[in-house]
Design a protein with these regions (language model features):
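Short hydrophobic/aromatic-rich motifs at helix boundaries and adjacent loops
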Residues: 1-4, 90-91, 120-123
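Glycine-centered loop/turn motif at secondary-structure junctions
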Residues: 1, 35-37, 125, 156-157
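Rossmann-like dinucleotide-binding cores of NAD(P)H-dependent redox enzymes
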Residues: 16, 20-30, 96-97, 102-106, ...
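Short, flexible micro-motifs
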Residues: 4, 46, 75-77, 112-117
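Short polybasic/polar patches that bind polyanions
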Residues: 5, 34, 71, 122, ...
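Residue-level detector of short coil/turn "hinge" positions at structural boundaries
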Residues: 4, 40, 159-160
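FAD-binding core/adjacent interface of flavoenzyme oxidoreductases
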Residues: 23-108, 165, 179-195
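Glycine-rich active-site loop/strand segments that organize a redox cofactor
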Residues: 1-17
């Protein structure tokens, strides 16, 4: 007979796969820009006129003139001042480099990135709770588009709390104790990780 073992997730192979995908996408965009004759310049820029920008990068500063500019600003994870400094509190960058899969995770924010992370961690086996300040997930999106996604997430996630606010978080040996406020009610829960 044949005996199959319980499937396991190899986090190091998963990270390697993710890094290969990111490297391919980044390299592909750089190659496409070069192929189209686009000069890619890194730094902090500001327009000095409609056809000129001043770019600062490290100790270098220069002015560039052009009829057209493509501004690719990228993004940085938001830092929430009420969260304690604790390695179990991660941002979206750290969430893609896990050392272990948490048994449960609170995701603060029901925007696109938060929902991507909820889907990933749910698929990895974590119990996922999402908290969103507004009455709708992905608040800037047409509600008719959000409803089908929310139905799927309700099946995959432990809990989705909308119109709810995180008011504090305290790190302890047990986990991260997070206090919430919904309407006039306050309550707390403990999570292994918070994103």
């Amino acid at each position: 007979g044949i005996v199959f073992k319980e499937p396991e997730i190899d986090l190091s192979k998963m990270k390697e796969w993710k890094n290969n995908i990111i490297g391919g996408l980044t390299g592909g965009l750089s190659g496409l820009a070069k192929q189209r004759g686009v000069d890619v310049i890194h730094g902090t820029a500001k327009f000095s006129s409609k056809n000129e920008i001043e770019v600062n990068h490290e100790s270098d500063s220069r002015r560039i003139s052009s009829d057209q500019f493509i501004i690719a600003v990228g993004s940085e994870p938001a830092e929430l001042s009420f969260l304690p400094d604790d390695p179990r509190i991660i941002d979206s960058t750290g969430a893609l480099e896990p050392d272990q899969i948490p048994s449960d995770i609170l995701i603060i924010g029901g925007g696109i990135i938060g929902l991507e992370m909820a889907t990933i961690y749910s698929a990895l086996g974590s119990e996922v709770t999402i908290v969103e300040l507004t009455k709708q997930l992905m608040p800037e999106t047409d509600p008719d588009l959000v409803r089908p996604l929310e139905r799927i997430l309700n099946k995959k996630c432990k809990k989705i709390m909308k119109s709810s606010q995180v008011i504090s978080a305290i790190a302890s040996d047990e986990g991260i104790s997070v206090s919430f406020k919904k309407d006039d009610e306050e309550f707390s829960e403990i999570f292994q990780n918070v994103l």
